[in-house]
Amino acid sequence: MRCGPLYRFLWLWPYLSYVEAVPIRKVQDDTKTLIKTIVTRINDISHTQSVSSKQRVTGLDFIPGLHPLLSLSKMDQTLAIYQQILASLPSRNVIQISNDLENLRDLLHLLAASKSCPLPQVRALESLESLGVVLEASLYSTEVVALSRLQGSLQDMLRQLDLSPGC
């Protein structure tokens, strides 16, 4: 009888079965750290300080504003909108921020999975179809307003993560 491979497998089994899951607290801390990093990157772009995140600009109503209570799915949806907006901007300032938003969304998906609430896939939003026209008319304003509102939304998310948001 050829039991060599079986014995090797049984000998390795304790090592193979010992898989340590990433503690959810670590994921939450990483999420908060990444949010703070993105806010710092936005602060480093000097022209974003000139607009309040609460200010309304005609034609830019599709850019999400502040939300007092955010669930994980609402956070993901909001970040997806900002990611689409930033990806359409030609500015080199927003490339890293857009990449950070993708990573942040991945961390939110991990947090949601830990609570057994998978987040639905976010598809392209209809409100962003007019983005091309708005960008042609006011590229600079769109960038400033989007980054300013993103910064406010991220700060709301940071506060909400301390309260352990629901699905």
UniProtKB/Swiss-Prot annotation:
Residues 1-21 form the signal peptide. GO terms for molecular function: hormone activity; peptide hormone receptor binding. One of its GO terms (cellular component) is extracellular space. InterPro entries: 4_helix_cytokine-like_core (IPR009079), Leptin (IPR000065). It is found in: Secreted. The keyword Secreted applies. Keywords: Disulfide bond, Obesity, Secreted, Signal. Disulfide bonds join 117-167. It comes from the Eukaryota. GO terms for biological process: activation of protein kinase C activity; bone growth; cellular response to leptin stimulus; energy reserve metabolic process; intestinal absorption; leptin-mediated signaling pathway; lipid metabolic process; negative regulation of appetite by leptin-mediated signaling pathway. Belongs to the leptin family. Key player in the regulation of energy balance and body weight control. Once released into the circulation, has central and peripheral effects by binding LEPR, found in many tissues, which results in the activation of several major signaling pathways. In the hypothalamus, acts as an appetite-regulating factor that induces a decrease in food intake and an increase in energy consumption by inducing anorexinogenic factors and suppressing orexigenic neuropeptides, also regulates bone mass and secretion of hypothalamo-pituitary-adrenal hormones. This is Leptin.
